[in-house]
Amino acid sequence: MFAALLFEGWSNHEVDAAKTRSPCTSPAPDAVAAGNGPVIGINRNRIQTAAMPARTVALTFDGGPDPVWTPRLLDLLRGRRAHATFFLYGAQAARHPDLVRRIRAEGHEIGSNTYTGAVLGEASPARFAAELDLTQAALAGTVNLHTSLLRMPRTTSPDTLCGREWQAARQATARGYVLVTADKAARKPAQGLVRQFSQTETAYQETRKLLGDRGVDRFTTVSDGLGLTPYTPAGAAARWQGTALIWGTALGRAFSHAMTWVLGIAGALGVLRLAGLAFFARAHVRRLERFRPGAPWMREVTEPVTVLVPAYNEEAGIASTVYSLLESTHRDLQIIVIDDGSTDRTAEIAAAIDDPRVEVIRQPNAGKAAALNTGLAQARNAIIVMVDADTVFEPDAVHRLIQPLAHPAVGAVSGNTKVGNRRGLLAKWQHLEYCFGFNLDRRMFEVLECMTTVPGAIGAFRRDALLGVGGISDDTLAEDTDLTMALWRAGWRVLYEESAVAWTEVPTSLRQLWRQRYRWCYGTIQAMGKHRGAVLGVGTAGRFGRRGLTYLALFQVVLPLLAPVIDVYALYGVLFLDPWQSAGVWFAFLAVQLVSAGYALRLDGERRRTLWSMPLQIFVYRQLMYLVVIQSVVALLLGSRLRWQRMKRSGTAAEQIGGPAPYKSVPTR
């Protein structure tokens, strides 16, 4: 399919250097320019020319077949009992084989006008051969013939066979072609002439006028007027090649048309998504100002909190995580570190922290969901905060995170996860993704009441809500997404608290990033399948299903799956369409993304100088994410089971946050 698309693009170059003719540097030979006529052959270096007999006109039509004007010309010729010679583009013949067959069936003659209309004098040797051979293949596949008549594109009268065109003409005649040009306009029909037309409305009107000329006895084909043999039957191999060419052309054309629609729809959806994110982000800001904690009618939540920290081989960052929690302004905490069978010193480091609020539970390795359920069973408080063991909390994060739970309908709250280790290009790209992608999405999800994920790095829950859905399920690899969807289906609302900031460590190598995102994507698609029934639900569950699941399916599965195809078609546009127009569309879309990303960074209180890396992110990072989605979907379709993939921690997030140039930022409204 890709090869067919490339061939379709080559056949339909909008900008093609081989279709532009250079000025002649030497005149046509005298035997051609001042010869007996416009039909030219070369036999053993001897130039022979011929003209139509008196009162005989050979009507010739270049290009096409055109689906609009060729049928009208054929109808006109049939009505006047006239015949003509059609010099066809091979590419058009392959696209419209029925018209080629009609031309032949109605007694008209077919010649070659090359495959794409390339100027043969400007073509490379390979292009020269392809232009002629592919046209013969198209004719063999449609009407089972090999033509010996050739009209070279961008030539009219014999004297236009000058400079490079004459060299190309000699090569063509060496292949057995007879060259057909046209008589000059000053020659009268009664003298006998070859008249040249295109297959257009103008040609139709001029042909109709010429057919009424009383000085002409016969309108016929070039070969009939001169007694030439224009065809030989095509061989079996040529017919097979021609048939394959026609089918390949049809496939490439269908794929090109489909991709035009896909690219248009995907581009429109992308722009609408960006506009929607900006609109709903602003709506979220206004909502925070009116209806969320800080408003006089919302009580302050001061109840004690249990913090669950599941950990597996997290010795690099567990101490920073626990100490950041102990520095919380919300003092009434129960911090439970659940060591899930670590093979390093995670449990020892956590147990060595001398604070009565910290408890360490050891269990055999059973996975993150099991560790969280173990901690939930030991929780003493009605409010549960779940934290990844590589996350560092701001001092006021816990207190801010639990404030939306003042509303009795709220069952869970997502915090604002920020990238702590931002040194390096890969980390900067993920920082942009967290602000521009994840956090803008969460603002929109809250307004639309369809939050899809409370991240494992920072999230608050009602204990009753967790127990009501059976705790944390291990049915999927994205237990946080699975849990969030289950809460919506149970009738709970889920909100986003932007001011509750926690810093997480992101992968610093492509291998680690791939494994992490593969797990996220695989688990998210699993959760979508598990909770697909929410689409048909009512009330809170139904709103979540129809909005949240539809959004995930469209923008996180379908469009990424189409991304490689869209990229191929974008490359097609650069190579075969107007490159300036294609580049203009791409830069316009990039500008929209930069503006949206800048707005997202401003809302999160972040510096906007990171935007310089965004063009590179689009070319490299997003392609990686698209491939992750493709691999996840293929793995699910094949029934593959993916194990939990743990990322090797370095503790650099905590070091960089507390370093000489900390990334402290406060969301703005």
Q: Could you tell me what each predicted segment is?
A:
Residues 1-59, 66-79, 208, 215-246, ...:
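N-terminal pre-catalytic segment of deacetylase/amide-hydrolase enzymes
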Residues 303-306, 334, 467, 482:
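Cell-envelope/extracellular polymer assembly enzymes that use nucleotide-activated donors
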Residues 364-365, 369-377, 381-382, 387, ...:
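Long helical/loop segments within the catalytic core of UDP-sugar-dependent glycosyltransferases
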